[in-house]
């Protein structure tokens, strides 16, 4: 029967028809028969790199150090490479440009406040002179005279701030920072001179009682004066800036270098504080004048209230100026600023590595907020190679942590005291 032969021929036909289907499914695996030797070698080399074969790995150095791994650009950007000591010192210590920029910003704020205050004083002083003349009120005229004194003091302070920004000269090597202190002293002395004049006039009115006052004009002028002096008080108040900022944030809150109240007056401007005391005295006097005007307006027979307010004003101004006088005296006598503790600073310097002792530490203020230090330290023997590092750490501690304006660090190796060879010393000891 031709059945088996026909079946074989049918199967062969089916294979030929299905061959392309099987070829498509297996073509991805049958590449070895068509790839040349050169292409195969290239593929094998690629496979070696991807598989990180040991034959292509870099050789280990003879000294046993680990080979440096080749990293791509992204991994290098993500890495935090260790900095050298010189790089750390450059990163930690502020440069002169940064210090000058901060100082210019601080002076610009002070000048802005004082300029606005001077304009307000000038405008209201003219208004008080007119109102006092119309009301025949000695209290208002005296208040206008007080504002004239305050205006002259602020102008003097602005002049001092302008001169203090000038570069040092051969004669004044520290610059003109102390002019701000001088202007603060002069303004306080002007307040005391005015206080004496007010007390004298008040006593004359108390004794003679031969004056008449227009209560209506006095009341209106005094009310405007209170409003203006309240604005001046908010403008010149520095109570929100008494805390040490970036210079002392690393110190603990109970650090001995801080004032007991937690505030530091070292960052204030003495000129603005003096102007604030003037504004406070003006406010007290304006309130007193307002009370006196109210009494005189409705009870003219009690016009003695005018000199009584002058007495109270004099006592309050004397009390408020005592702190400025004390701070000014400390600066002139080159005392340590009240917000710094010499013993605590010495302890902090002694904690620096390789420091044997702190021989001398002198701290004073050029002006308010500009503390200066000179320190002489001895290092342990054999640490001469670390002098630059120790000096950098000491300067960083004084400038950044304790907020010094300038500092000088002197280093030397520790040496035991040698036997005295001076003839005078030996003769005196015998």
From Swiss-Prot:
Ranges of Low complexity composition bias in the record: 249-264
Protein name: Probable proton-coupled zinc antiporter SLC30A4
Similarity comment: family membership: Belongs to the cation diffusion facilitator (CDF) transporter (TC 2.A.4) family. SLC30A subfamily.
Predominant location category: membrane
Subcellular location(s) of the protein: Endosome membrane; Late endosome membrane; Lysosome membrane
Membrane topology per record: Multi-pass membrane protein
Membrane side Lumenal: residue ranges: 135-143, 200-216, 297-311
Gene Ontology cellular component list: cytoplasm; endosome membrane; late endosome; late endosome membrane; lysosomal membrane; plasma membrane
Transmembrane domains' residue ranges: 114-134, 144-164, 179-199, 217-237, 276-296, 312-332
Binding-site positions, Zn(2+): 146, 150, 278, 282
Induction (free text): No change in response to zinc deprivation.
Tissue-specific expression: Widely expressed. Highly expressed in brain and testis. Also expressed in small intestine, medulla, lung, kidney, stomach and colon. Expressed at lower level in other tissues.
Gene of this entry: Slc30a4
Quaternary structure (record): Homodimerization could regulate efficiency for zinc transport. Interacts with TMEM163.
Region (Disordered): 245-265
Region (Zinc binding): 240-265
A Pfam family it matches: Cation_efflux
